[in-house]
Amino acid sequence: MDIFSEKRILTVSQLTSLIRGVLEENFEHVWVEGEVSNLATPASGHLYFTLKDGAAQIRCVMFRASSRALKFRPRDGMGLIVRGRVTVYDQRGEYQLLVEYLEPRGIGALQLAFIQLKEQLAREGLFADEHKKPIPPLPQKIGVVTSATGAAIHDILTVLNRRFANVEILIRPVKVQGEGAAEEIAAAIDDFNRYGVIDVMIVGRGGGSLEDLWAFNEEMVARAIHRSRIPVISAVGHEVDFTIADFVADLRAPTPSAAAELVVKSKEELAARLEFLRHRLVQGGRQVLAERRGELDSLNRSLRDPSMLVGHLSQRVDDLSARLERGTANSVRRHRGSLDLLTTNLRLTNPAVRLERARERVIALAGRNETLLRRFLDHLREKTLVAAARLDTLSPLATMARGYSIVLKLPERCLVTDSARLAPGDRVELCLRRGRAGCCVESSSDT
């Protein structure tokens, strides 16, 4: 009798299949918590890792269809809570957990995804101040990326029309939450940059939960803002809400209404600024005029009396003329003495030829002396005229020729340069370009 005739003999595959059926039937949906180790993320998009605690471990796999929905990236050492079903991997004869959903232990998945992306972009320098573009002080065209039906666009338009109705507004309607919202927002930012028709851009929406605002935490939106050549103002949610877009944007506004107030100044503010600048310009002009007036007064005080200068020059000309006359007379006397000596010698020797030569020499010397004297006098006269012309240019007389006058207080005839030295009833004399005039002071002012 065959001892194996009543026994059921299974193949390895059959046994494995039976075990898999038992496990999958009894552990169809289980929640398990543990620590991640041996995490692998191949190009296929699947996740392979081990979930362990202090006493045991189980292999886990999460296929690409499920892993692509994750908002955060699991890491070795991270505590996870996973949901899945227990199955058997036939090729190794090992049981494993087929994970359908997972979340970080102790913190929400979205919050962890926010922290991870923020740290990554900060390391890449997307939040650095050197990338922040200045907001134009008075934009002509403003682009708005938001929902066409939300409260945000209404608030933005209301504030802009109230503060500066002349500004042109271009609205790019997009989804601001749900599937596809991040793609639409990033595309709208790129479109505005592609066409380049605006000066500044507002990107935002009204308040909501973390899930509602999540499109503004997506990496594609952050990178679209960072590569924008047009300055971007983020205006997402309420004042307490912060998104990744806020950190990347060139300026963060706490609400859409605040963004509209930041992007344009009101007409009243601009008018007040212009009045302030006008006042500064007038004050500066008055100060410059006062400084130039002081410099002119200083120059007038430093100049000597032109008539005295001309008198000194005339006296020097007379002195030089007298010296020339004396020099000429002495020269003539010397030559006359020489002539007399020659005449005496000629009378003694009676040489006709020598006498004629001596006469010619005397005539030549006299002519040369006269020429030199004339040249010297002409040169001196020319220098005198040039000096007189230069003095006339610097003289207050030239200024008086343009309508100015010199004021002398009577009876002491002292020069007046400050109205504070005059009082009503004082007698003054005006020195004009031609002539003088007596006047009586009726009033005086320092302006």
UniProtKB/Swiss-Prot annotation:
Its main location: cytoplasm. Keywords: Cytoplasm, Exonuclease, Hydrolase, Nuclease. It catalyses: Exonucleolytic cleavage in either 5'- to 3'- or 3'- to 5'-direction to yield nucleoside 5'-phosphates. One of its GO terms (biological process) is DNA catabolic process. GO terms for cellular component: cytoplasm; exodeoxyribonuclease VII complex. InterPro entries: Exonuc_VII_L (IPR003753), Exonuc_VII_lsu_C (IPR020579), OB-fold_nuc-bd_dom (IPR025824). Belongs to the XseA family. This is Exodeoxyribonuclease 7 large subunit. It comes from Geobacter sulfurreducens (strain ATCC 51573 / DSM 12127 / PCA).
